[in-house]
From Swiss-Prot:
Keywords, ordered alphabetically: Coiled coil, Virion
InterPro entries in the cross-refs: MoxR, P-loop_NTPase, RavA_ATPases
Keyword Coiled coil: yes
Species, as recorded: Acidianus two-tailed virus
Name listed for the protein in its UniProt record: Structural protein ORF618
Cysteines joined through disulfide linkages: none
Residue intervals passing through the bilayer: none
Localization terms from the record: Virion
Main location: virion
Coiled coil: 570-598
A Gene Ontology cellular-component term: virion component
Amino acid sequence: MSQQPSGQGISEKIQNLASKYGQMLNELDKAVVGRYDSKTAVLLGLMTGFPTLLVGDRGVAKTMLIELLPKVIEGLNDKDVFVVQVSEYTDPSEIFGVPDIQKLVNGEGFDLKTDGFLPSAKVAFIDEIFYTSEKVRSTLLRAINEKKINVFGKEIKLPWIAFYAAANKVDLENPSDLALLDRFNIRGFILDIPFIMDNVDKLADETMQVMSASENPELKKVITLNDVEETRKVLDQMVRDFFNSKEALDLLKKVYYVIGDILASLKDTDAYESFYRSADEDYTHISTRARKRLNYVAASIALVRGATKPTYLDYLLALLFTLPVDVQSFKIVRDKIRDEWNKAVSGQEDTDATKVILDYLNDRLLTEAFIKASKMFDTSRNAIENLGKKIPLAQPFENREPTLVSSLPKIVEFLTRPEPISYSIWLMTKDKNGKINVGREKTGELSGNPLQKLEELLKLLESYRKVLDEADSPEERKTLILGLSKLVVNFGSTSSYQNGYKVPFLTLLDAISLFINNLKSTDVQKVIEQVVNDAKNNALKSISNGAPEVSGWEVFAPLLEQYGMKVPGILEAKRQIEDRAKGLSKNLDNTVTEIMNAGEKIMEMDDEMTKTFISLAS
């Protein structure tokens, strides 16, 4: 096709072009609702420069899409686009230009006026191309093949960068139609929705979109003619690099096996008899030109999604735009490709991509939120030291300050462990006579994400505050506080306290009080938003880097859904990440609010215990 691109690295060029082509499709969506098959065929024709045939009923936006190209491509004007609807009565002059009478009168010889006709067009569109007369058709064949025409002995080079044609149907029994059909390297079949009763929802949805859309939307020019030229150089390099790689041979064998299976399904069709059966009737024929166009179309699909080389899925989608030759063969190819595609994608869904990401959001995300908040403890050492100075150096509190400083990391470590943690503590209860007793040992488990564990811990501590509230007198309350001061909370792995940690009850209250105080002095919503966004972006990055062969399919998702083909699992994971992140922001905010409310009560208990010991020591 073209020379090797220079300047930026190939990967950077691909990312830049992929972004622009994605924007181009978005712009076209503003003016044409649905019709993703048409848009994709037009896009592939523009990228590759391959002549492209659009086959479909009237009113499926074939002409409209071509006429929209100047609105989205910088450097392409309306006058650069030649659109004509032909019939068997169309005169060659309506396509190739009219004689310049003035030059003949002036004795300057014969010439054509080509402004506004095919010879001056950068983009050409011939509607109902199979209705052309033989006289017009022979000239068109050369215009498509060689980008040249000869009119009255004058050789004219054609400047078109994209050549499109449209038809309602293809007559495979007409040799002349077959010759013309073979020149179109890309063929898009645009089928309207069959069986209205079976597609009520889709029809209603599309109608709503059409009726609510702006009649003349303002489109942006998001790509340039230079970008189109650069694309073809990049495609050359992508194809060249791919065929120099080790995986190319195995991948092509896999693709050709699918092609063989499809052609076997076509054996009783007109398409096979007219187009794919070789001169030796025992063999199926696929031309070198057809194999070449398949590689470039697959590379184009890969480029649009930002990949540096085509994959099996790119080739499968490319077959839909290169293999069928009429509506009947398209339906067979589409169904076979859909089955093979969904089988391949289902295999990818079994990978751990989605699970890993959702686990990340469910667990690691909240762990990071807690760790970020817990790091604020470091700024509270002065508060801890000041607290320690206020408390008399009497048993059991002589080590309160250093115990708290050393306990904080351990408390955070246990709360942020991914697995559940067990605990044991002695219960304080009030008997029927009103006497407060330290009763049996209570054991339990804190599970869930770190904030859920903290929430459960606060509920546990809340039960002791309720016991305090049931005290009948200040003296009884002091007695209870002294009893609480002797309690120790044991943390450990589930069902075992091996490698566990003992935390004095009061130290635990101090730690929670500091945590709640820090939350109160922090813009919690901002912290949550930052943590969620960081985690989401890291997840999106890791999932894309981990599976490049199934990344970037967002741009083709509507087309895949139109054909009944599953969107690769990586895209579904990304969607779930976005949805999960939104939900997590809200859930985190609610959880922190609940923790703050519960924490306030724990702080009151901690404050009362501190004041009690200060008063006892004075």
